[in-house]
Structure formats: C-alpha cells, structure tokens
C-alpha cells in the first residue's frame, strides 16, 4: 500500500488540442513536413502521421508508397479537399449549407469517417427542418385558397373547381372536378385531411427544394377520403391501373405535399389515354395530362431494385437504404457493398493507389493488382472445378466456365457430371 501511495498520476486534459495547435503552427512554417498533397493544382504540405490518423485513404497511400508527393483529383473543388485536410490539424470544419453534399462526397472518398457522420447528420437535420417549415406554409396557403374559392363561388358559378394531385415521388397528374354548389363540402374535406396529415405524416416524405418560390403551386395529394363525404361532391373515381398502383402503393391514407412549377398547369390535356375516369357528365377538365407531365418531369432517379422512380436525389438516397444499396453521386450507379463504391469513386477521381513494384503500373483495386502480380510470378491460383485448367485471372476463369461449361463461378457440377468430365 505504501508503494502505491508513492505513485503520482497526472492527466493532461488539453494535451491533444495543444499538440494539434503546435503541429499546425509547424505546418504553416513548413517545418518537419514530410509529405506534399496535391489536390488538382492546390498544394497542401503536412505531416504523414497526422493525415494518416484522420484519413484511412491517406494512411493506405503512405503504406503503399514512400513518396513524399501524393496527387489527388477531386472533381468537385480543390478548396473542399484542402479544408478537409486542414481540419485534421484544427479539429473544426466550416461547411456552407449548399456545399454539404460536396463535403460529404469528398470526405467519403478520403474515408474520413468522423466528417462523413457529421455531414450525414446535418443533411438529415436540415431536410427535416425544411420539410416542417414547408408543411406549415402549405397549411396556411391551403386555408387561404379554400377561403378564396368560397368567396368566388357566385362569380364562377358555371365553372368547376380543379385540384391537381401529384405524388412526391412521381410526376403523375390527377384532376378532380367539383361542382360549385358543393364547394363547402370540398373545404371541410380539405381541412379534415389537413389535420389528418399532421397525425399520420410519413418520415420518408421530403423535398429537395429549401424554400417555396412565388411562381410555384402548393399542391395536395388526396389518396383516400371517406366515401360518405365524397359521393355528394361528385369526385372522380380512379380506374384500375397498374401505373396508379405503382405510384400510390406507399402513400395510401396520407397527404403528400409537393411543389410543381407553374408551367405544369399549362400543359395541354389532349392525350388519348388517362389514368382516372370521370363520373360527372359534361365536365371537360384536363384529365389526360399524365404523358405530358412525364415528358416535363422525367424520373431522373430510377430504383434498380423496384419500379419506383424519384425526382429528387434526397428521396432516392432514403429509398436506397431500404434495399441496402450504395449510390455514386457522380454517375448514379449503385453498389451492394461499400468497398465497391469506394473503388468506383476512385475511378471517377482518377486515383490509382495500388502500384505494381515490378513494372510500376497502377490500379484502382487491390484485387486487380493481385491478378496483375500473377503475371510476373507465373502463379495460376484460379482453378476450374469442372476440369483441370487453371488461370492467372479470375475474369478468365469466369469466361471459361460460361463459354465451355455453361456455368457461373459460384455453380458446381453435380457429382455424376463431374465424373463424366473426368472420364473425358
């Protein structure tokens, strides 16, 4: 006990911050810097130990080569890359809201996990805040719009009220026609559904636009309404359509808020086939505008696993999480494994971090480098389980199995077929 009491323990809580500040000061004075990072045409001098501790990508670069110069091509902005590397010394990063995706992409490429997590949290936070603000603004606009409809009832007695419905994730246009004498029913229905939307709002609903513009239309999507209140209002009933079920399968019993540019309302409705049938005779509203809207707002993001399509990348990214897919923000290609996405991004950036020590040829993936080394060593590690042939490259084995045996690399021959192959 006496020996333990003689031991004094000191804890320096600010040691990490102080060391980083001094290291950054030495970097600014270009003292003890052992590596130069070139991001496009921008040079950043630093210390390998600091950069390797903050970036897995930089650590792998330093392990693969002993060169004092590392070149990185970041397509978005060299300034973004420089600030990311500088944050390794300062422990802080200032990101403009409109450049959040740029920083997220660059940090993912540099494998700076702590920055990726912060950017992802910030992106989700701002999307939720913007969605809440938009919903509040839309509720006010809906009330004002309903009041104007009631006031103008006498002036427009020969006209029908039109409600354009557009789902958040698809450019489908639906027109409902309500006679002027039933406008009170419409107003009460909209108000009740607005309250219901607050209680049943789905967390998946969002919009990429940060704020409404003056020339945009505030639009409601009415998916299901009680039949008692609708029959008197002469609402149009939907026809059976596979296309309708595709777009509305996940939005039943909910109100979906969205925005559409004012020019959408001007699209002529002269298509030959519509999605909804009219129960009210004599109405001549634009009910066949679906094809025109699809031409104006084509689905820019099509899910590779299901028929759903999306206009906004934020909605598309959220949907891909359901399928456990990883999206390349540069070209839109999806991957089932994150390591394949990282390798794909290196191809966009022009980075080939794996180099052959024999011929100095560079590659984007370690597996490709290993196949290349088999050429120098003469090894043939890939063996066909159907015959005695072996190959240097895995791609050559796959081609052999497909062309000669009609099988993929993961399939094995039945035992009797294998014995027959050996006899031949």
Swiss-Prot record:
GO terms for cellular component: nucleoplasm. A zinc finger (C2H2-type) spans 301-323, 326-348, 354-376, 382-405. It comes from the Eukaryota. It is found in: Nucleus. Residues 408-424 have a biased composition (Basic and acidic residues). Gene3D superfamilies: Classic Zinc Finger, Potassium Channel Kv1.1, Chain A. Residues 33-97 form the BTB domain. SMART domains: BTB, ZnF_C2H2. Its main location: nucleus. GO terms for biological process: negative regulation of transcription by RNA polymerase II; regulation of cytokine production; regulation of immune system process. Residues 403-424 are annotated as: Disordered. PROSITE patterns: BTB, ZINC_FINGER_C2H2_1, ZINC_FINGER_C2H2_2. The modification Phosphoserine is found at residue 202. The keyword Signal does not apply. One of its GO terms (molecular function) is DNA-binding transcription repressor activity, RNA polymerase II-specific. Keywords: DNA-binding, Metal-binding, Nucleus, Phosphoprotein, Repeat, Transcription, Transcription regulation, Zinc, Zinc-finger. InterPro entries: BTB/POZ_dom (IPR000210), SKP1/BTB/POZ_sf (IPR011333), Znf_C2H2_sf (IPR036236), Znf_C2H2_type (IPR013087), ZnFinger_BTB_dom_contain (IPR050457). PANTHER family: AGAP004733-PA, ZINC FINGER AND BTB DOMAIN-CONTAINING PROTEIN 44 ISOFORM X1. May be involved in transcriptional regulation. This is Zinc finger and BTB domain-containing protein 6.
